[in-house]
Structure formats: structure tokens, C-alpha cells
Amino acid sequence: MKKFIFIGDSLTYGYGVYREESWVNKISALNKLTVFNKGINGDTTPSMLNRFFNDVTSKIPEYVFLMGGTNDLLCGRSVKSIIDNIEEMIKEALSIKSNIFIGIPPIIIPKMANKLFMPSDLYNYCEKSLPLLRAELLNLCSNYNVSYIDFYTLCNKNLYKNIFLDGIHLNSLGNDIMFKEACKIFSL
């Protein structure tokens, strides 16, 4: 079976839901690919870039999914720094001829996150920066001819369905929506 490595943060890992409810683990359960979930709760793009060789490149996977940036924004980092890090990871994955998919991070809900996750003054900055991150990621995907999954738009469209656990992370319904969209994009 072909190897598919998913690298990212808690949105890739499946924070807050049972393992079998995580969108990445649902893809693994299809038994069509050998899936490695390298999502780490709280991870940022500098950290992902730092571990990219060990977790991804050295394994020579046929497919790579990469999503990050929300935690960077929650640390006050710029969209440019996120894009620079993701671009380096794209170049590295292309150097081993992997098929790459970029995840565009979902929206966040600052009011809900302040109440249910933890208080932070940076939620509004993150919320305002995510559309810019989305636009820059779309440009990056176009420049490198890389596929993407637009979880930002997907979550925006499904917001009325109560898909969030805490304003940042998705609940089991949110993960199911992500899983179905990923299956379409991955042709599974």
C-alpha cells in the first residue's frame, strides 16, 4: 500500500475527539493507504519544518498532507512567516516526488474559544489573519501546482451545524465533514 503522511497540529492530530472520530484516522480505517498521522497538539510551522525530514522526507511517502498556521497566529506570528515555512516543506516534499496536499486551516470562533478553550488576546488577530493565510496558501498551491483542501471555506459553510468543540478544534461532526471533504479531494 502507498504511504500517506499527514503532518500538522491538533487539527490534524484529532484533538478533543475519540481516535476513531478523527478525520485522519477515518481515512486510515478505509485501508486503502498506509497512513501516518504526524499531527502534534500545539505545533507551529517552525516546529513542523524542523521535524519535516525525520517525520516525512526520510520516509519517502507517495502522498503528503500538510496543514498548519493556526497556532502560529495564536502566538502572534505573521502570515508571511507561516507561508515561508510551508513553502520550504513543499519544496522538500517535491524533492522526493511526493504528491502534496495543503490543508487550509478552518476558521476560529474567538468568543467560543475564550469561553471553552482558554482566554487569549490573540483570537481576534488569528480570526482576522486566517482569510489572508487562506489567500496566500492558495497562491502557494497555484505557484507549485499543489492540491489543497479548503477547510476554511468548508467550516464557514457548515458553521450553523455546531461543528466546533471549543471555537478552535472541531467536534466529531466537524471531523466527519473534514473526512468527507478529504475523501473527495484524495479520490478515496
Regions found by a protein language model. Give the residues of each.
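Serine-esterase "nucleophile elbow" of acetyl-processing enzymes
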Residues: 1-47, 51-60, 177
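Alpha-helical cap/lid subdomain in secreted, periplasmic
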Residues: 30, 50-188
